[in-house]
Amino acid sequence: MFLKNFTVNNKTALVTGSGKGIGKACALALAEAGANVIILSRTEKDLLIVQNKIKKLKKKCSYYVCDVTNLKEIKKIFSEINKLDILVNNAGTNRPEYFTKIKRKDMSEVVDLNIKASFDIAQLATKVTVSYTHLTLPTSVTV
């Protein structure tokens, strides 16, 4: 267990970008600590792998294949969520390029995902949360 002294029994957590990497690790750690988890990613294959691991922990797990920069998709997802206690707004990207070589289009994609989508999701999450909700926004902007 990643979080020995941390318990979130019967809480509902939503983790964006949870098909791989940090998001996957957060989703699994929250399930190990007792949470039911809603996972979001663009790749269904990755989500199914994470969902199977969470279900082996005897926790509920639902998933949504989506592009979190698409506000219409995100609004639809949040319209289906009745309860949310924890948000890990993990989806993010960067452009590993010299600053002088980054194209404006690429920078716009980074801003759309790392800033605008994170804002939209956090704002929508506040409409379905219960008191003492935890919002985590680990996305950082790196140029």
Predicted region positions:
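Flexible N-terminal pre-Rossmann segment of NAD(P)-dependent oxidoreductases
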Residues: M1-K11
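Conserved glycine-rich cofactor-binding loop
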Residues: T12, G19-G21
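Conserved glycine-rich Rossmann-like NAD(P)H-binding loop of the short-chain dehydrogenase/reductase
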Residues: A35-I49
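The beta1-alpha1 cofactor-binding region of Rossmann-like NAD(H)/NADP(H)-dependent oxidoreductases
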Residues: K45, Y64-K76, R104
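Substrate-binding pocket helix/loop in short-chain dehydrogenase/reductase
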Residues: Y98-F99, K103-V111
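A short, exposed helix-loop element centered on a Lys and neighboring polar residues
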Residues: A122-Q123
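Conserved small/polar residues in nucleotide/adenosyl-binding loops
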Residues: T133-T139
